């Protein structure tokens, strides 16, 4: 039985065709995958199938309907955590109440509770969360929250007994263990409910594990439709070969982490992190990767090394400076550090040149000299100035939040550290990132997805940092673009001697780029050494069957 019919579907944004005469069908009980590079039109297609985006030409029919698709589809989006801060089962019951009564999400009356609870437990079984029914949603892990959201979304399909599940890049940012659980849940939902599932992803391993059939979208057109392996081979044809880097690792440790411990405790939530006695070195010129399951403390360790947080115990020496001690030495050190966070954003209407000059000036000698004079004039201690200066390296939302708590705005940073540019010579960095000088006059809104990633890298590299920290900023890139990024990073390391420390869940990326890797698990450092061996141990501990099957395909 055909459940989804798409014929000559075209969607335009101005003169740009996001989708161009797209046609395909999907059968009941089929898991249909859609693959393509970033910007190929995958998410646009999913939004049209959901009924949340109009189209210009063509026909779309789902379960015999040509409109009101929201009534017969469920959608699961990447990084969407809208949940009630109540027990898990309440989140499902509220959704069921809204569906059955065409009302707001409320809890039913006491006499109705048992009937709602029975259905809610069956839905929780589908997503593997029945054992968590009484836990509060806000203390679930990221992967568990993803599955709870999926449970809420499929409630309508469960109630109606039919529907189509739409998945847009599910679990892209999840660790292998969380990803495995979500993939198994998707299979379970298809098997138990017998519904059609349409999934977009740029990750070949997800399509290999889940899909019965695969469509390749390229520049808004269907380039290929058929066997999963054949379509993936076509998709990956354009991947460049890996750059052969000549390592230049020095004997001295540019970062020393000694007996570092860090604990987080949440009221009503209990202990969320308890890293204990972590010690390791990073040699100058080395590319070191940190790997481990979600919530183990990878980002925390990176933030500690970058001086954005302080350890509860232990010491961290970065380029000869104790980064746990606030003061002018630490401020000077920050000039030699660059950091890219998991979610980076660029202001749409700024030119690349302005962004680069601004960043260069903010970390320049004159800005720091001005801060020293201004601090003396205002009677500010070096500790306060340092605490403010470190905010230039945190994500924008965190910076604004911390300043608001102090009753300040971002103006205070720029008054202390005015971005004065003495000389602007970006050519070397641009060339290493394969960006022409014409990029400088372009606004962010005019850039392609790949260009935005490289400009974000250039912002951190324009100051020629000795150390570059990367906290999973490339987790949602397609494998073709990710190979390009790996090559650029190896070139940067080779040409400028930049020490790179990165956090990633992508084992292929880690194996390709790293000199050494460390594995965090069970609140401690459990393995350190050869990236291939560390990644194999990570996969073993994660019980990630989809990755084991992927390795078999490659071998």
From Swiss-Prot:
Residues the record lists as binding ATP 2: 292-299
Keyword S-adenosyl-L-methionine among UniProt keywords: no
Residues the record lists as binding ATP 1: 36-43
InterPro entries, A to Z: AAA+_ATPase (IPR003593), ABC_transporter-like_ATP-bd (IPR003439), ABC_transporter-like_CS (IPR017871), P-loop_NTPase (IPR027417)
The entry's keywords: ATP-binding, Nucleotide-binding, Repeat, Transport
Annotated GO MF terms: ATP binding; ATP hydrolysis activity
Gene3D superfamilies given in the database record: P-loop containing nucleotide triphosphate hydrolases (3.40.50.300)
Family: Belongs to the ABC transporter superfamily.
PANTHER family: PHOSPHONATES UTILIZATION ATP-BINDING PROTEIN PHNK-RELATED
Protein name stated in the entry: Uncharacterized ABC transporter ATP-binding protein MJ1662
């Amino acid at each position: 039985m055909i459940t989804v019919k798409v014929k000559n579907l075209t969607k335009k944004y101005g003169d740009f065709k996001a989708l161009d005469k797209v046609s395909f069908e999907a059968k009941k009980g089929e898991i249909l995958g859609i693959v393509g590079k970033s910007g190929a039109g995958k998410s646009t297609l999913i939004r049209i199938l959901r009924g949340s985006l109009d189209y210009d030409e063509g026909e779309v029919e789902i379960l015999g309907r040509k409109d009101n698709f929201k009534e017969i589809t469920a959608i699961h989006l990447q990084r969407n955590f809208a949940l009630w801060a109540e027990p898990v089962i309440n989140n499902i019951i509220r959704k069921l109440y809204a569906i059955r009564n065409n009302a707001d999400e409320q809890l039913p009356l006491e006499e109705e509770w048992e009937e709602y609870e029975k259905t809610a437990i069956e839905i929780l079984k589908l997503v593997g969360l029945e054992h968590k029914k009484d836990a509060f949603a806000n203390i679930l892990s990221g992967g568990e929250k993803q599955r709870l959201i999926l449970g809420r979304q499929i409630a309508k399909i469960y109630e109606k007994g039919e529907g189509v599940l739409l998945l847009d890049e599910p679990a892209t940012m999840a660790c292998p263990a969380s990803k495995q659980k979500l993939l198994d849940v998707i299979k379970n939902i298809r098997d138990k409910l017998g519904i059609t599932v349409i999934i977009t992803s740029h990750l070949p391993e997800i399509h290999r594990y889940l899909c019965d059939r695969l469509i390749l979208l390229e520049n808004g057109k269907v380039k290929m439709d058929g066997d999963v392996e054949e379509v993936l081979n076509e998709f990956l044809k354009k991947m460049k070969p890996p750059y052969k880097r000549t390592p230049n690792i020095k004997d001295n440790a540019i970062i020393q982490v000694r007996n570092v411990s860090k604990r987080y405790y949440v009221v009503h939530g209990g202990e969320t992190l308890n890293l204990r006695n972590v010690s390791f070195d990073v040699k100058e010129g080395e590319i070191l990767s940190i790997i481990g399951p979600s919530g183990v403390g990878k980002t925390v360790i990176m933030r500690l090394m970058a001086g954005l947080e302080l350890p509860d115990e232990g010491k961290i020496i970065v380029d000869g400076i104790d980064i746990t001690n606030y003061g002018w030495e630490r401020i000077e050190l920050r000039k030699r550090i660059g950091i890219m966070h998991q979610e980076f954003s660029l202001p749409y209407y700024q030119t690349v040149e302005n962004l680069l000059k601004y960043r260069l000036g903010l970390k320049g000698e004159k800005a720091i000299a001005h801060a020293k004079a201004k601090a003396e004039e205002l009677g500010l201690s070096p500790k306060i100035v340092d605490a403010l200066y470190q905010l230039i390296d945190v994500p924008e939302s965190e910076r604004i939040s911390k300043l608001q708590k102090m009753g300040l705005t971002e103006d205070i940073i720029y008054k202390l550290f005015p971005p004065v540019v003495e000389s602007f010579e970006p050519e070397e960095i641009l060339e290493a990132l394969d960006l022409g000088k014409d990029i400088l006059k372009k606004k962010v809104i005019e850039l392609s997805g790949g260009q935005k990633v490289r400009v974000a890298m250039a912002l951190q590299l324009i100051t020629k940092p000795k150390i570059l920290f990367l906290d999973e900023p490339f987790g949602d890139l397609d494998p073709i673009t990710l190979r390009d990024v790996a090559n650029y990073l190896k070139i940067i390391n080779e040409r400028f001697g930049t020490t790179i420390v990165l956090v990633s869940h992508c084992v292929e990326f880690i194996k390709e780029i790293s000199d050494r890797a460390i594995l965090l698990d069970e609140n401690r450092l459990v393995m350190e050494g050869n990236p291939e061996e560390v990644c194999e141990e990570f996969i073993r501990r994660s019980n990630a069957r989809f990755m084991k099957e992927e390795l078999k395909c490659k071998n």
